[in-house]
């Protein structure tokens, strides 16, 4: 993240977000991350995966947006897709509840892993609103500038093409609802899938089936929410 020319970013996103890399907040964010690395702090996800959500789901391919907060802060977990973990890592509790709702809603078998890469490849933008975190220090990079960048991503997606689905789970994700044009898109909200709240309305929300129904009604191929075995 030292200069726009060196950022490995999928071309459609690089073009859409070009002006953001010239903003003062981005220079401050780069300097913050440089200082964190210089201090020997371990930052997740690894550098090449910071923009994995964008690189996995080009702008023209986006059908569904799921918002998370910040990356998992344990070793080998985060790989740049919200709620998702790298293969071989135990499925985190919130994702376990997402799988439970998929089973209830669409009778999809619960997979043996927590990697959601196949969703991203189909057009599900799995976007954390903060894209980095210090090891074992949740929310340590919140308020450092990423929020401006990811707010702009949400706006760009909302403006780019109609008939997308935004799944906003929990108060933090729902605080971004103002960035979405609800006259052009389907916005579905519920409590967060965390074990602390999932039984207060996440389980039973039917969001996955409702998302696919909306896409199909608008001539868009639905998401295959099944995850291949790894």
Curated annotation (Swiss-Prot):
SUPFAM superfamilies: Uracil-DNA glycosylase-like (SSF52141). The keyword Cell membrane does not apply. One of its GO terms (cellular component) is cytoplasm. InterPro entries: UDG_fam1, Ura-DNA_Glyclase_AS, Uracil-DNA_glycosylase-like, Uracil-DNA_glycosylase-like_sf. PANTHER family: URACIL-DNA GLYCOSYLASE. Belongs to the uracil-DNA glycosylase (UDG) superfamily. UNG family. This is Uracil-DNA glycosylase. CDD domains: UDG-F1-like. Excises uracil residues from the DNA which can arise as a result of misincorporation of dUMP residues by DNA polymerase or due to deamination of cytosine. Its main location: cytoplasm. It catalyses: Hydrolyzes single-stranded DNA or mismatched double-stranded DNA and polynucleotides, releasing free uracil. GO terms for biological process: base-excision repair, AP site formation via deaminated base removal. It comes from the Bacteria. GO terms for molecular function: uracil DNA N-glycosylase activity. Keywords: Cytoplasm, DNA damage, DNA repair, Hydrolase. The gene is ung. It is found in: Cytoplasm. Its EC number is 3.2.2.27. The active site is at residue 70. It is an enzyme of class 3 (hydrolase). It comes from Pseudomonas syringae pv. syringae (strain B728a).
């Amino acid at each position: 993240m030292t200069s726009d020319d060196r950022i490995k970013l999928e071309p459609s996103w690089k073009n859409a977000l070009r002006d953001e890399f010239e903003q003062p907040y981005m220079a401050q964010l780069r300097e913050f991350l440089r200082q964190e690395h210089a201090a020997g702090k371990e930052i997740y996800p690894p550098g090449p995966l910071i923009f994995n959500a964008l690189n996995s789901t080009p702008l023209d391919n986006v059908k569904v947006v799921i918002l998370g907060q910040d990356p998992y802060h344990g070793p080998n977990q985060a790989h740049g897709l919200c709620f998702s973990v790298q293969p071989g890592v135990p499925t985190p509790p919130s994702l376990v509840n997402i799988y439970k709702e998929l089973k209830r809603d669409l009778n999809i078998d619960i997979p043996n892993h927590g990697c959601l890469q196949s969703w991203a490849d189909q057009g599900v933008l799995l976007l954390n609103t903060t894209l980095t975190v210090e090891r074992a220090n949740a929310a340590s990079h919140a308020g450092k500038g990423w929020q401006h960048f990811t707010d702009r991503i949400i706006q760009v997606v909302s403006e780019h093409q109609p008939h997308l689905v935004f799944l906003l789970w929990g108060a933090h994700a729902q605080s971004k609802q103002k960035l979405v044009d609800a006259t052009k898109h389907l916005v579905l909200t519920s409590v967060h899938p965390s074990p602390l709240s999932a039984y207060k309305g996440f389980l039973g929300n039917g969001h996955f089936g409702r998302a696919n129904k909306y896409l199909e009604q608008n001539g868009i191929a639905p998401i295959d929410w099944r995850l291949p075995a790894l």
